[in-house]
Amino acid sequence: MKKEELKDFCKSIGIDCVGIAGVGPYYDLEKIIKQRLFNGYTTGMEEPIIEKRVNPKETMENVKSIIVCAFPYYIGNFNESNLSKYCYGEDYHIVVKDMLQQICNHLSDNIDNFDYKIFADNGPLVDRYLAYLSGI
């Protein structure tokens, strides 16, 4: 399947921001991660094994490319609250995974032996870096 066909399908299901990232390994990212660790700029939620963050083949040995999607996140204004906005409405992990599953189902229907893994802000790779690489 061509990249434009994939993007057209994604638009048909409401995903306007789609790109394709290469599979690395991402040695420039490794340097950034090590510097952030040295400076203490971590949240504790990151994958602790750096190689898993910079080498997609550690997560999926036969990976050929990475489809990256960005989703709008506006849920309205809540001025009188101490809760983060992501706490309102349906869990975005569920919504995003459902939409990504639609893409994977479409690809599985059109590509023999299509294999995939879905991550929605919960995988070992660095989402923002993949978005950068994919051009979105």
Feature roles, as predicted:
Residues 1-136:
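Auxiliary alpha/beta "docking" domains used to position bulky ligands
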